[in-house]
């Protein structure tokens, strides 16, 4: 288990103070997006307790229970249960804790999420057979997707997608999903991200009818499957901005695949960003997403994820 997890007990008065803090947080009250979490902020520990039912005294017991459930289910011989056991046999307790947190310490539901995690990889092997830093680096450098280097005021990791310059002939939809999968795996190593979750901003300014026509239903379904029950991630909000009128046609293809919980977290703003700015501060957003920072730089983010790129290294697909 990560050493960053808190080991102190809080009395009710302290808990009330921390709950009050949670209502007034800014982006500066959270840890870094990239790299491990050295120590969870006290208010984040309180959030885990309140929202995820996490308790120090039951954390290890829950992990052990999930590990035992994996083995017990595999003993039945059911194909997916066996695949789950094989996939996790060398994983540490921190890996299991991600799934338990994502399902609010309900071990049975955490196991179902683990099944979904493995099944997604079996169902779409094309996303994982060549998944490596070298395979996805140039896609991430191009900004598909982007990741802000600062968390939002809720402590969430903010992922970006700007569709205007996307050419499917140059970067395929599967290559974009590969990059999403790699980033999710990487950033979920951070415990603060496990607890606070993700927010996704999709800028559809410049979305053309040709792009809309090129999006296959099977690709859109694959994207939705990635967001639902396939990662130990809390997707807290998906914001669409600057979408044209014909975006509705694409969205109507996706909506039947969305479960009610995720559908309630989708916000379609158009060009009126007043409600959007109530949730996402302008001062953490790049200018191409309506913020005050310089234009998004995918190469800088790739260096945060992978380190500097050697000149001789070939990261093309």
Swiss-Prot record:
Could you tell me which residue ranges the CRAL-TRIO domain spans? 136-297
CDD domains referenced in this protein's UniProt entry, alphabetically: SEC14
Q: Which Pfam families match?
A: CRAL_TRIO, CRAL_TRIO_N
What tissue specificity does the UniProt entry give? Retina and pineal gland. Not present in photoreceptor cells but is expressed abundantly in the adjacent retinal pigment epithelium (RPE) and in the Mueller glial cells of the retina.
* N-acetylserine sites (modified residues): 2
| GO terms assigned for molecular function | 11-cis retinal binding; phosphatidylinositol bisphosphate binding; retinol binding
Is Metal-binding a UniProt keyword of this protein?
no
Tell me the residue numbers annotated for binding 11-cis-retinal.
Answer: 180, 202
Claim: Cytoplasm is one of the keywords in the record: yes
List, alphabetically, the PROSITE patterns matched.
CRAL_TRIO
Q: Which disorder does the record name? A: Bothnia retinal dystrophy: A type of retinitis punctata albescens. Affected individuals show night blindness from early childhood with features consistent with retinitis punctata albescens and macular degeneration. Rod-cone dystrophy Newfoundland: A rod-cone dystrophy reminiscent of retinitis punctata albescens but with a substantially lower age at onset and more-rapid and distinctive progression. Rod-cone dystrophies results from initial loss of rod photoreceptors, later followed by cone photoreceptors loss.
PANTHER family linked to this entry: ALPHA-TOCOPHEROL TRANSFER PROTEIN-RELATED (PTHR10174), RETINALDEHYDE-BINDING PROTEIN 1 (PTHR10174:SF200)
**What does the UniProt record say this protein does?**
Soluble retinoid carrier essential the proper function of both rod and cone photoreceptors. Participates in the regeneration of active 11-cis-retinol and 11-cis-retinaldehyde, from the inactive 11-trans products of the rhodopsin photocycle and in the de novo synthesis of these retinoids from 11-trans metabolic precursors. The cycling of retinoids between photoreceptor and adjacent pigment epithelium cells is known as the 'visual cycle'.
Q: How does it assemble?
A: Interacts with DEGS1; the interaction increases synthesis of chromophore-precursors by DEGS1.
Return the protein name.
Retinaldehyde-binding protein 1
Give the organism the record lists: Homo sapiens (Human)
Gene symbol of the encoding locus: RLBP1
């Amino acid at each position: 288990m990560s050493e960053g997890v808190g080991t102190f007990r809080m009395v009710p008065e302290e808990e009330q103070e921390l709950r009050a803090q949670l209502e007034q947080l800014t982006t500066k009250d959270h840890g870094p997006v990239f790299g491990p979490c050295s120590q969870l902020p006290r208010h984040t520990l309180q959030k885990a307790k309140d929202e995820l039912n996490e308790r120090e005294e039951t954390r290890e017991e829950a992990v052990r229970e999930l590990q035992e459930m994996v083995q017990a289910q595999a003993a039945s011989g059911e194909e997916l249960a066996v695949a789950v056991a094989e996939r996790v046999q060398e994983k540490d307790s921190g890996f299991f804790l991600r799934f338990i947190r994502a399902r609010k310490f309900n071990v049975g539901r955490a196991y179902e999420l683990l099944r979904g995690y493995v099944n997604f990889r079996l169902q779409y092997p094309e996303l994982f057979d060549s998944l490596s830093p070298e395979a996805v680096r140039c896609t991430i450098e191009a900004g598909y997707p982007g990741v802000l280097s600062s968390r939002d005021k809720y402590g969430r990791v903010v992922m970006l997608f700007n569709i205007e310059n996307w050419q499917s002939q140059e970067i395929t939809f599967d290559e974009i999903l590969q990059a999403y999968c790699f980033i999710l795996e990487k950033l979920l190593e951070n415990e603060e991200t496990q607890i606070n979750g993700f927010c996704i901003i999709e800028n559809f300014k410049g979305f053309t009818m040709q792009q809309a026509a090129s999006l296959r239903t099977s690709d859109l379904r694959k994207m939705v499957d990635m967001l639902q029950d396939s990662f130990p991630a809390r997707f807290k909000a998906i914001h669409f901005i600057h979408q044209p009128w014909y975006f509705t046609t694409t969205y109507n293809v996706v909506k039947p695949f969305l479960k009610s919980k995720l559908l309630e977290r989708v916000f379609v703003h158009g060009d009126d960003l007043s409600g959007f700015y109530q949730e996402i501060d302008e001062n953490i957003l790049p200018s191409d997403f309506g913020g005050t920072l310089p234009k998004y730089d995918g190469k800088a983010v790739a260096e945060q994820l992978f380190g500097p790129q050697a000149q001789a290294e070939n990261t093309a697909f």
